[in-house]
Amino acid sequence: MLNNKRLFTSESVTEGHPDKIADQVSDAILDAILKDDPNARVACETTVTTGMALIAGEISTTTYVDIPKVVRETIKEIGYTRAKYGYDYETMAILTAIDEQSPDIAQGVDKALEYRDKDSEEEIEATGAGDQGLMFGYATNETETYMPLAIYLSHQLAKRLSDVRKDGTLNYLRPDGKVQVTVEYDENDNPVRIDTIVVSTQHAEDVTLEQIQEDIKAHVIYPTVPENLINEQTKFYINPTGRFVIGGPQGDAGLTGRKIIVDTYGGIARHGGGCFSGKDPTKVDRSAAYAARYVAKNIVAAGLADQCEVQLAYAIGVAEPVSIAIDTFGTGKVSEGQLVEAVRKHFDLRPAGIIKMLDLKQPIYKQTAAYGHFGRTDVLFPWEKLDKVEELKDAVK
């Protein structure tokens, strides 16, 4: 008999992973600037490696931010507070190399500076995209958060791994860690069980592998994963190399924007290639990806599809998206053409329209930079709102 089961795997990383440190530092700097200057232009890249961080990019702002102070506070919050961890917020070196935004880019983004503080139609029309590019948003009804199960559980496990470190439950854990979850789907594409869970966590030198494996199951996996999804066939790989003492930036260099699949949908949807962290909302890499998730989530919540992927594309200096594409993977209750028309009618997808619609000039970005930008249960981001459901239903009647 033919076995129609299907496996799909996604991963997440903890806030102490080198690439995630870089994302959080970039977004902490962005938030510090937006708090005093909501109209600032920020493109902030971070590199972390043993004993140092490099902050580079283009920033145009009317405010002053003590960048080294922001960096140190962020590293401290993550948990790199002792030299024996291989990275220490107090003693690390911090290099900065910041320029202003290119005037060639700026003139395409804001032709109408006189409308800068007004939400007028003229300002929205005059604000062009900060770059060309394509962005995707996705939603599915397989979880209550409208996220794929594998990435949702990966984030929940990674967050739990950090929580039990920070609250002292497992005080031998260190900040770096990774999680991977493999979900089995039945022939109707419904998730039925967890096939494999991988957890790799940095730890103190004096703890045994057996204790780590026992504690991670008891304090991280079992309290997080619904018991009906785990059975005797579920495989657990906990620190499968046997040792993970050297970690964080001492073990691997980290860079902003290197965890774009972790940040989004765990590989189940397509990705346009642009990262989010360190970018102000005039950068459509970030704001349009948030808008695309907002659109897709409302379509699925409205019952118009079981799965939905939305693609938006832009030209630099042009306000209107050059294309809007929707794929419901055969699960749509109405045609994809009808959905596109409804989206054009009820969502303003011009860059300034997105910023206004989702209130994106707020300093909310640091909290997005670990454990996913979408489907979070610990914080409600504006692009997760379900306030367009009735409008979409009415539009396709």
Swiss-Prot record:
Keyword Nuclease: no
Enzyme type, top EC level: transferase
Annotated ATP binding sites: 17, 176-178, 243-244, 252, 258-259, 279
Keyword NAD in annotation: no
Principal location: cytoplasm
Pathway entry: Amino-acid biosynthesis; S-adenosyl-L-methionine biosynthesis; S-adenosyl-L-methionine from L-methionine: step 1/1
The enzyme's E.C. designation: 2.5.1.6
Highest taxon listed in the record's lineage: Bacteria
Cofactor binding summary note: Binds 2 divalent ions per subunit.
Localization, UniProt: Cytoplasm
Gene Ontology CC: cytoplasm
HAMAP family per the UniProt record, alphabetical: S_AdoMet_synth1
Family indicated by similarity: Belongs to the AdoMet synthase family.
Function field: Catalyzes the formation of S-adenosylmethionine (AdoMet) from methionine and ATP. The overall synthetic reaction is composed of two sequential steps, AdoMet formation and the subsequent tripolyphosphate hydrolysis which occurs prior to release of AdoMet from the enzyme.
Subunit structure, interactors included: Homotetramer; dimer of dimers.
Protein's recorded name: S-adenosylmethionine synthase
